[in-house]
Design a protein with these regions (language model features):
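NAD(P)-cofactor binding segment of oxidoreductase domains
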Residues: 1-16
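Helix C-cap/helix->beta junction micro-motif
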Residues: 7-11, 61, 143
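Catalytic helix-loop patch of NAD(P)-dependent Rossmann-fold dehydrogenases
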Residues: 14, 22-68, 75
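Active-site beta-alpha turn of Rossmann-fold NAD(P)-dependent dehydrogenases/reductases
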Residues: 19-21, 69-71, 125
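Short glycine/proline- and charge-enriched loop/turn segments
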Residues: 31-41, 85-91, 156
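NAD(P)-dependent short-chain dehydrogenase/reductase
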Residues: 56-108, 112
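Residue-level signal for the nucleotide or nucleotide-sugar donor/cofactor binding architecture
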Residues: 98-101, 130, 170, 180-183
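Mid/C-terminal beta-alpha module of Rossmann-like enzyme folds, strongest
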Residues: 109-167, 191, 200-211
Length: 211
């Protein structure tokens, strides 16, 4: 990414880097937010260390690079990379409020940013927080009434994982100034789950019905 950023800067070419917001850690995401200028403070996994370092380097190209931070990407597909699919298949879930990205809504907005050649860092997550339990409760209400799950604590989770998990709330002030139509996270996820239920995406595939 850095080589591309350097070359694009030299050639006056707009460059979009799709990074992550999983480079921060808050003890209580409901009480603090990270804006676009915040420095990475989560080093609990090699992934976050590399991504955090890259995020810092991208700030050196604020005149030519759009540095996009996404978190816990969500769609209406039963895809193993979909955050909803992941947590519905876990044996136990550690429920913590987090910022998340509903891709069918926010990817088109990212394309608009690219077309208008916006630069700098942007927290591309839906405004607000939602917990794992809130998502699973909606999943049970909308998609599968028979679904059940079991919780465990952060301490219990850390004992079985090879690396720790990032939990945080990203500040969406800039995003809402640029695109005020972006839905709050709970509303956007509900639309995805309604699409799952209607279109039976386990067989047919599909995205959230968000225009």
């Amino acid at each position: 990414p850095i080589t591309l950023a350097i070359q694009c800067s030299k050639l006056n070419i707009h460059y979009t880097y799709l990074g992550t917001g999983c480079i921060f850690l808050a003890d209580d995401p409901t009480k603090s937010m990270y804006n676009e200028d915040a420095l990475p403070d989560f080093f609990g996994s090699s992934y976050s260390v590399v991504k955090g370092y890259t995020d810092r380097l991208m700030h050196n190209f604020n005149d030519s690079v759009l540095n996009v931070r996404i978190r816990m990407p969500i769609t209406a597909d039963y895809n193993p990379r979909n955050f909803i699919t992941k947590i519905t298949t876990y044996s136990k879930v550690c429920s913590i409020p987090n910022s998340m990205t509903v891709l069918p809504e926010l990817l088109p907005i990212m394309i608009k940013m690219m077309e208008s050649k916006k630069v700098g860092t942007i927290n591309l997550t839906n405004p607000g927080l939602i917990s794992h339990n809130e998502i699973l409760q909606m999943y049970k209400e909308i998609v599968n009434p028979k679904f059940t799950w079991e919780n465990f604590t952060v301490e219990e989770q850390n004992k079985i994982l090879l690396s720790k998990r990032s939990n945080n709330q990203l500040d969406n002030t800039k995003l809402k100034e640029w695109y005020p139509e972006v839905l709050p996270i709970k509303d956007s996820i509900r639309k995805c789950l309604e699409d799952m239920a209607i279109h039976n995406t386990t067989k047919n595939g599909g995205g959230c019905s968000i225009n």
